[in-house]
Amino acid sequence: MDTRQEDTGRPDESREGIRQMAVRQVDTREYVSVLREIAEEGKVVPMLISGSSMSPFLCHNRDYIYFTRPERELRRGDMVFYRRDSGQYVMHRIYKVKPEGYYMTGDAQTQIEGPLRREQIFALIVQVKRKGKVIRPGDFWWEFFEHVWIRIVPARRAVTALYSFLK
């Protein structure tokens, strides 16, 4: 059931009596372009995750990323926001840094994308909200995905299949 409706600026009552906020659909490129400008001013910008490429760490329409312009050298394991040559905006993790550019992958992926130029990368993710809990660098899950999960890209399918089997 699609609960999206025209934004009236006030919550609406659903049939179940639960108050819901109206959702406005906007063009993704336009929306992210505005957020990018804010991040490039040095502000931290929150954004709801859309898509499943960063699963199992981040889940579609549940978790949030918080990003800002990078103030340091980018390195393997960093989550970054970038714009592909096609104009599509993507948030993935740096798999490898080489002289010719940056190589990226999502946490749910085994394919490596790249090389990307440094100027395509406009933001560094500095914290996330996962299942309602804020996770920052230094926290267990942040460090696990940044340092361990990024190193097992070829084995990810087997690891996630085993996890699903054991659940």
Predicted regions and their residues:
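Extended hydrophobic leader/signal-anchor segments used for secretion and membrane insertion
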Residues: 2-4, 9-167
